[in-house]
């Protein structure tokens, strides 16, 4: 009897595995193909060997699998609920550990200080820009831990966020790169004003402050920018209550943390901007006032059937391969912004202050940063990245 029970359970297990594989792979064959045959190049180190090539394809496949696994969020939420039920303060999700900070914000621990060669690529890019007479600044978007780490983290949590940031920025500064550190320019803001409870991004007000800092840096380096349109008092703050449920919140579900308020900043000055978003061969052109051309409030703030939106952070535009802004009423300066998702709203705000701005996501594009500098011929280069971009070699940055 026991033998038949064992066989039945084994058969049921195999059937479940086959079902999950089928529901994961069949709808996403194109995604896996793109990862293995195209996106893998973003994982290749310098002077890649055959084995590096194979490893890069495996990494691209694994990342895609993790993103599209069938009912991934449901499994994660069940896992989180079970861990909370037995009193755990640190939630384990295989390759990451999540905690709640003392203020209630969700945060993924950074458990090592390993940097990628991207940090040194930035130093090389800065040297190239200097050789072309183009000033460059690196804007560091810190993740969550502003202030005393030990005062924010639960007892027993081990984290190397600040140590890794210090290590990376020291290399950049020693290499001659100008650095704007958000831990410095956001120091006086309350934590709840600059980080979300359910998401890892910085808030819209934090992004505006970063843009204002860049505007001041541009003028200090001889690149005209209208700093007045970046000031806090030039924007109306609109708060939508209990609407935003970010990526971290989705991992543990609304039973474990509630959707949060989301603040938008709307210009109180007149503007007319043309923006062209490019995603591969696709192109979208919008023009008009900032709120109409750049912002996408209706789409981003639309609540789903569960009563929240997971897309609020897209209110200032998509994380496109390229977003080119043209503003005839601003000073005639051209700025190249190399960014991750933290930099999307920064570039959007900055488009009010300069005549031309090209924002690129180097994780997606096939052109290197040097290519963009050569083609766009900017007056200044601004790099806006969070720490994760300095930890992982996941985009093309410099020509070899």
Region spans (language model):
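Extracellular glycan-modifying ectodomains
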Residues: 1-400
């Amino acid at each position: 009897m026991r033998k038949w029970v064992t066989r039945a359970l084994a058969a049921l297990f195999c059937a479940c595995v086959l079902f999950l594989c089928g529901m994961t792979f069949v709808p996403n064959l194109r995604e896996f193909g793109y990862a293995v045959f195209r996106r893998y190049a973003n994982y290749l180190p310098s002077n890649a060997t055959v084995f590096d090539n194979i490893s890069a394809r495996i990494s691209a496949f694994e990342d895609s699998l993790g993103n599209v696994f069938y009912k991934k969020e449901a499994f994660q939420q069940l896992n989180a609920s079970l861990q909370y039920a037995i009193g755990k303060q640190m939630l384990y999700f295989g390759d990451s550990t999540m905690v709640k900070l003392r203020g209630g914000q969700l945060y993924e621990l950074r458990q090592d200080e390993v940097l990628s060669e991207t940090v040194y690529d930035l130093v090389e890019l800065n040297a190239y820009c200097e050789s072309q007479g183009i000033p460059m600044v690196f804007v560091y978007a810190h993740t969550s831990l502003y202030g005393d780490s030990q005062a924010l983290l639960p007892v027993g949590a081990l984290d190397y966020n600040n140590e890794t940031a210090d290590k990376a920025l020291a290399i950049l500064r020693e290499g001659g790169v100008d650095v704007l550190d958000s831990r410095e320019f956001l120091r006086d803001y309350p934590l709840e004003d600059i980080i979300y409870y359910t998401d890892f991004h910085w808030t819209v007000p934090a992004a505006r402050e970063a843009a204002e800092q860049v505007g001041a840096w541009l003028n200090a380096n001889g690149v005209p920018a209208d700093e007045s349109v970046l000031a806090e008092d030039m924007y109306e703050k609109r708060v939508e209550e209990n609407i935003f449920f970010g990526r971290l919140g989705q991992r543990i579900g609304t039973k474990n943390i509630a959707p949060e308020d989301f603040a938008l900043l709307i210009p109180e000055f007149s503007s007319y901007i043309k923006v062209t978003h490019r995603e591969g061969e696709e192109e979208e052109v919008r023009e008009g006032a900032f709120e109409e051309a750049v912002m996408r409030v209706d789409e981003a703030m639309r609540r789903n059937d569960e009563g929240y939106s997971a897309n609020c952070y897209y209110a200032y535009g998509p994380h496109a391969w390229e977003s080119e802004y043209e503003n005839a009423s601003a000073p005639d300066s051209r700025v190249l912004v190399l960014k991750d998702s933290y930099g999307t709203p920064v570039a959007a705000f900055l488009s009010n202050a300069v005549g031309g701005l090209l924002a690129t996501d180097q994780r997606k594009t096939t052109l290197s940063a040097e290519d963009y500098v050569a083609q766009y011929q900017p007056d200044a280069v601004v790099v806006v990245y969070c720490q994760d971009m300095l930890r992982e070699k996941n985009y093309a940055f410099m020509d070899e």
